[in-house]
Amino acid sequence: MVARLGPPSPAGAVYRVPDSREGWVEALCKLTDLAEDGGGEITFDVSDVRPRGSIIHGFGGVASGPGPLIEMLANVADVLNGCVGRPYTPLDLMEVDHAIAAAVIAGGVRRSARMSTLPWRDEANIFRFISCKSDPAHHWSTNISVAVDADFFEALDAGDSHARAVLEEVATGMAVNGEPGLVNMSLAQVGETSTDLVPNPCAEIFLEAFEPCCLGHLNLA
């Protein structure tokens, strides 16, 4: 496949995608690097990727073939092209993440789980975020929760209009499809030494970057 980012440009590099998880990741990195470098054209040769239905001996399950990879690269390119000339928004990045997750899920085995959160103070994006799953065709690969804190509840008690509007929209969404949830970042910090914490996909536990999601101690408790 050929991916073009930005205005028309001469033919660019060719990347022959290896038949491995690392190869798929590298293909995505080459696409996003191209966007960061100002755009251009790149061709992805997927002839080495094993066909759909092949057994995956190491991980288990069956291969999804090159189709989901091509679709993911095309969808990410569409998102990046839509951002030319402006900063990325949280919803743009969620679209990229969703495209990646959809490619990972393909193959008949549950291989991807996501949680997306956005701070309640982000007035520019929070209401679009809250309603982003109202269309079942979008963002079905992620759970979504609004990140609140002690200030949020104090603002509610003080009658703050933005905090009240956020809570009302959250409640409306919950009544329709159960989302978004609320994650209390102030409570998540109790007893923790790091301020850079994010919830796991089901929000049972808060983790630092690259920390393994082990729920054994929660289950034992």
Model region roles, listed by residue range:
Residues 1-72, 173-221:
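Function-dense linear segments that define catalytic or interfacial modules
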